[in-house]
């Protein structure tokens, strides 16, 4: 399998508010930058979406080192929160509906397709790729005319 590095970040100007996501993919000396945004969204939704979009951009199953500053996303996968949520009918330990279920459902088959290792990086600490992703995500969040995130409430 090909080895790919993916760096991701999400940004929200207000929470909820206009938000942006970014993913930078690196493979064999090439780099691809992706980004987008929505109005009326949250930072956590943009963080998850950045991971989804990065993984969806891969044309075949890959071994992925995924770098994120989102403990929420990383913990949901590595601490098996996703597994627990599924077993519990998409309810948290407190029996409340899991937020962002629509995005988690999009992420699950991507995690099954690729071999993904999550790496946490401290945000806003000078990590070059994280800073690049932050710039791209903020740029998208700052644009006018963003489509609404119609699933943001769920």
UniProtKB/Swiss-Prot annotation:
Positions of Mg(2+) 2 binding: 9, 134
Alphabetical list of InterPro entries matching this protein: RNase_H, RNaseH-like_sf, RNaseH_domain, RNaseH_sf, RNaseHI
Binding locations of Mg(2+) 1: 9, 47, 69
UniProt-listed Gene3D superfamilies: Ribonuclease H-like superfamily/Ribonuclease H
Residue ranges annotated for the RNase H type-1 domain, each copy included: 1-142
UniProt xrefs under CDD domains: RNase_HI_prokaryote_like
Keyword DNA damage on entry: no
Major localization class: cytoplasm
MF-aspect GO terms: magnesium ion binding; nucleic acid binding; RNA-DNA hybrid ribonuclease activity
Domain of life of the source: Bacteria
Keywords: Cytoplasm, Endonuclease, Hydrolase, Magnesium, Metal-binding, Nuclease
CC cofactor note: Binds 1 Mg(2+) ion per subunit. May bind a second metal ion at a regulatory site, or after substrate binding.
Enzyme class, broadest EC rank: hydrolase
Entry EC no(s): 3.1.26.4
Cofactor(s) for this UniProt protein: Mg(2+)
Subcellular location: Cytoplasm
GO cellular component: cytoplasm
Chain's role: Endonuclease that specifically degrades the RNA of RNA-DNA hybrids.
Protein name per the record: Ribonuclease H
Organism annotation: Oleidesulfovibrio alaskensis (strain ATCC BAA-1058 / DSM 17464 / G20) (Desulfovibrio alaskensis)
Gene: rnhA
